[in-house]
Curated annotation (Swiss-Prot):
Membrane topology: Multi-pass membrane protein
Gene Ontology annotations for the cellular component aspect, listed alphabetically: cation channel complex; dendrite membrane; plasma membrane
Designated name of the protein: Odorant receptor 85b
Stated family: Belongs to the insect chemoreceptor superfamily. Heteromeric odorant receptor channel (TC 1.A.69) family. Or49a subfamily.
Organism: Drosophila melanogaster
Keywords per UniProt: Cell membrane, Glycoprotein, Membrane, Olfaction, Receptor, Sensory transduction, Transducer, Transmembrane, Transmembrane helix
Topology feature Cytoplasmic, residues: 1-30, 88-126, 222-260, 313-360
Glycan-linked positions: 179
Pfam family, one: 7tm_6
Result after altering residue 208 to S: Increases odorant sensitivity
Note on domains (UniProt): Residues 146 to 150 play a role in odorant (2-heptanone) activation.
Cellular compartments annotated: Cell membrane
Length: 390
């Protein structure tokens, strides 16, 4: 099971978080994680605070475009910070969830083959690795874009004067461009960008690992039901049904636990992402220079890839849970006792109530959620365009 969790554990360690306990920790390890976490949080809070001050001052000076740009950065900070704190808050619940998943995790070659574990493990690992690398490359390219511009245009090609710039707009009450303070500010902003990105990647990849296991258990349940050969003996067949129902109920409880842990951060993620996509798209359509368009495009891709990843796994869970009702109907139930057939009707009725990944009670997450999000973003985009032209 650690193979499924390795990418999430790596990025959580980078921001000083242990999402679940795995035995006793030494005092030194706890201290190190504590220092790393609060160093990340304090720096990220500092950058977010001064970005907020910049937004206020930009609105006061009628610098609408700059204010919108800074708002998209604040949204990025908000999502990262919220995911980090919610995971720390839900550490006990996550530990209980992971322990229960370990209890039903298929160990041994025979069980691994029955559950088709290598396929699920390989798919989850590939998606997690590609997503982590994509998001990391996009964010670090965004963070270092201003430095690359300075060295390429100003120092190497000498075709235009760029000057020293910072990756994110924030209020700084002194002249920092030709001052030694530029370098600490550059480090602070890059550190904050890395913190927010790592906080988001780790939580997204953890959700993928947990959702993959839910899908695996739903699929195993469906295969077991569909391929089971009935004996026609009510006592023997009813024992099989009892085991299936208990297994199904356990998976449903695990699904509820996942929604309880991730529901609020997912809701906040979708709300903020709709604004971020809107803000970034707006900036790309108001005549900014081509190099800035490239920078904004990277930011847009990172936000949309995150939303699609969550929606994709939400769809997989929904399809797998509904597939159990189809598998139950496809069983050779016509050979069974009439009492067995009546029991199957109840099981089918229950399994047709689809299990979703939920952003609290407000949103069932599937691929169609991506469409809804883009529609909301476009509405805000149209509103911003109207305000800007007026």
């Amino acid at each position: 099971m650690e193979k499924l969790m390795k990418y999430a554990s790596f990025f959580y360690t980078a921001v000083g978080i242990r999402p679940y306990t795995n035995g006793e920790e030494s005092k030194m390890n706890k201290l190190i994680f504590h220092i790393v976490f609060w160093s990340n949080v304090i720096n990220l809070s500092f950058v977010g605070l001064f970005e907020s001050i910049y937004v206020y001052s930009a609105f006061m000076d009628n610098k609408f475009l700059e204010a919108v740009t800074a708002l998209s950065y604040i949204g990025f900070v908000t999502v990262g910070m919220s995911k980090m704190f919610f995971i720390r808050w839900k550490k006990t619940a996550i530990t209980e969830l992971i322990n229960e998943l370990k209890e039903i995790y298929p160990n041994g070659l025979i069980r691994e083959e029955r559950y088709n574990l290598p396929m699920y493990l390989g798919t989850c690992s590939r998606i997690s690795l590609i997503y982590s690398l994509l998001y990391s490359v996009l964010i670090w390219t965004f963070n270092l874009f201003c430095v690359m511009e300075y060295w390429v245009y100003d120092k190497w090609l000498n075709i235009r004067v760029v000057g020293k710039q910072l990756p994110y707009l924030m209020y700084i009450p002194w002249k920092w461009q030709d001052n030694w303070s530029y370098y600490p500010l550059l480090f602070s902003q890059n550190f904050a960008g890395y913190t927010s990105a790592a906080g988001q990647i780790s939580t997204d990849v953890l959700l993928c690992a947990v959702a993959t296991q839910l899908v695996m258990h739903f699929d195993f349940l469906s295969n077991s039901m569909e391929r089971h050969e009935l004996s026609g003996d009510w006592k023997k067949d009813s024992r099989f049904l009892v085991d299936i129902v208990r297994y199904h109920e356990r998976i449903l409880r695990l699904s509820d636990a996942v929604n309880d842990i991730f529901g609020i951060p997912l809701l906040l993620n979708f709300m903020v992402s709709s604004f971020v996509i809107c803000f970034v798209g707006f900036q790309m359509t108001v005549g900014v220079p081509p190099d800035i368009v490239v920078k904004l495009f990277l930011f847009l891709v990172s936000s949309m890839s995150q939303v699609y990843l969550i929606c994709h796994y939400g769809q997989l869970v929904a399809d797998a849970s509904y597939g159990f009702s189809v598998a139950t109907y496809n069983q050779k139930w016509y050979k069974a006792d009439v009492r067995y057939k009546r029991a199957l009707v109840i099981i089918i009725a229950r399994s047709q109530k689809v299990t979703f990944l939920k952003a609290t009670i407000f949103l069932d997450i599937t691929r169609s959620t991506m469409t809804d999000l883009l529609q909301i973003s476009y509405k805000f985009f149209a509103l911003l365009r109207t305000m800007y032209t007026q």
